[in-house]
Swiss-Prot record:
<keyword id="KW-0812">Transmembrane</keyword>
<dbReference type="InterPro" id="IPR002035">
    <property type="entry name" value="VWF_A"/>
</dbReference>
<feature type="transmembrane region" description="Helical">
    <location>
        <begin position="67"/>
        <end position="87"/>
    </location>
</feature>
<feature type="domain" description="VWFA">
    <location>
        <begin position="98"/>
        <end position="294"/>
    </location>
</feature>
<comment type="similarity">
    <text>Belongs to the UPF0353 family.</text>
</comment>
<feature type="transmembrane region" description="Helical">
    <location>
        <begin position="18"/>
        <end position="38"/>
    </location>
</feature>
<dbReference type="InterPro" id="IPR024163">
    <property type="entry name" value="Aerotolerance_reg_N"/>
</dbReference>
<dbReference type="InterPro" id="IPR022933">
    <property type="entry name" value="UPF0353"/>
</dbReference>
<dbReference type="GO" id="GO:0005886">
    <property type="term" value="C:plasma membrane"/>
</dbReference>
<dbReference type="InterPro" id="IPR050768">
    <property type="entry name" value="UPF0353/GerABKA_families"/>
</dbReference>
<protein>
    <recommendedName>
        <fullName>UPF0353 protein Mvan_2751</fullName>
    </recommendedName>
</protein>
<keyword id="KW-0472">Membrane</keyword>
<feature type="transmembrane region" description="Helical">
    <location>
        <begin position="309"/>
        <end position="329"/>
    </location>
</feature>
<keyword id="KW-1133">Transmembrane helix</keyword>
<dbReference type="Pfam" id="PF13519">
    <property type="entry name" value="VWA_2"/>
</dbReference>
<dbReference type="Pfam" id="PF07584">
    <property type="entry name" value="BatA"/>
</dbReference>
<keyword id="KW-1003">Cell membrane</keyword>
Length: 335
């Protein structure tokens, strides 16, 4: 947690836990203080004439005289926690990552169960995703129907990606596996170019589709969607799938109404096989929310951050109060 004016504080994730041995020193000081106070009390009892003692000694201090010592002990405890190096989770924007946005442009995307139609709604949500994605991430775009095409290689230029999204055109058939394989190739290519570390940059595929793969007919074929998902898993590239549409969608083909219900099951299996997440949306607003959630998930990473500052500041504040209390409470000179 982070407290106003004090900063981050935590009681977990200690980097130097052996500093807690200093608590033994603190306990020793507590024991020493108790022994000194007990000895002081015994010496007072040995004074034969208590009335004379009270007349010549300053007014006996109240129990408040122990407050400075208590505050000193608390400050030492706070400093001990700080020295142990507590940490907390910190979300920071990714500056080195690749995201491939893979969009289905098969004829089923003409369905109007999502106004004005599935493709137009997908374009609007995809552009919002591009705008919201953290600036350091390289975003690429692939459109697929019977074949897959890299429209924009991974880049931080969001305007180029949005311009390509606006130009998406419908085509026949649905080769989901080819779309995934093409995305994996683009990820590998840009990973070799970006470099900048001991390992390739983290990558993710965001696959947006409304229906079942038609080419090939068996998704377990060498070029099928399930095979591609397993390959993505092996390469450490999870796939986040977004199934978009309703069970009641249809398109007109040769004056015949052809049902094109959304296929949530296939897209969920693709996500599961790749180690990614599956999302569903049946309206434009739901789709926008899905992409907002994806942006939060993809655009940031969680790292361990220092959480000792708050303990140091509390310890310093309590130590200052202990010194002030010692001056005000235990002073010997009368006003």
């Amino acid at each position: 947690m982070t407290l106003p004016l004090l900063g981050p504080m935590s009681l977990s994730g200690f980097e130097h836990p052996w500093f807690f041995l200093f608590f033994l020193v603190v306990l020793g000081l507590v024991a020493l203080y108790v022994i000194v106070q007990m000895g002081r009390h015994r010496r007072m009892l040995r004074f034969a004439n208590m009335e004379l003692l009270e007349s010549v000694a300053p007014k006996r201090p109240s129990r408040w005289r122990h407050l400075p010592a208590v505050l000193l002990i608390l400050s030492l405890m706070s400093f001990t926690v700080a020295m142990a190096g507590p940490t907390h989770d910190v979300r920071i924007p990714r500056n080195r990552a690749v995201v491939m946005l893979v969009i289905d442009v098969s004829q089923s995307m003409r369905a109007t169960d999502v106004a004005p139609n599935r493709l137009v709604a997908a374009q609007e949500a995809a552009k919002q995703f591009a705008d919201q994605l953290t600036p350091g991430i390289n975003l690429g775009l692939i459109a697929y129907a019977g074949t897959a095409t890299v429209l924009v290689s991974p880049t931080t230029n969001r305007e180029a990606t949005k311009a390509a999204i606006d130009k998406l055109q419908l085509a026949d058939r649905t080769a989901t596996g080819e779309g995934i394989f093409t995305a994996l190739q683009a990820v590998a290519t840009v990973g070799a170019v970006i470099g900048g570390g001991d390992e390739p940059p983290p990558a993710r595929i965001v696959l947006m589709s409304d229906g079942k793969e038609t080419v090939p007919s068996n998704p377990d074929n060498p070029k099928g969607a399930y095979t591609a998902a397993r390959t993505a898993k092996d390469q450490g590239v999870p796939i986040s799938t977004v199934s978009f549409g309703t069970p009641y969608g249809y398109v007109e083909i040769n004056d015949q109404r052809q049902p094109v219900p959304v296929d949530d099951e296939m897209l969920k299996k693709i996500a599961d096989l790749s180690g990614g997440d599956a999302f569903t949306a049946s309206s434009l607003e739901q789709l926008k929310q899905v992409f907002t959630n994806l942006q939060e998930q993809i655009g940031y990473e969680t790292i361990k951050g220092d959480a000792s500052v708050g303990w140091l500041r509390i310890g310093s504040l309590v130590l200052a109060l202990a010194a002030l209390g010692a001056l005000l409470i235990n002073r010997r000179l009368p006003n």
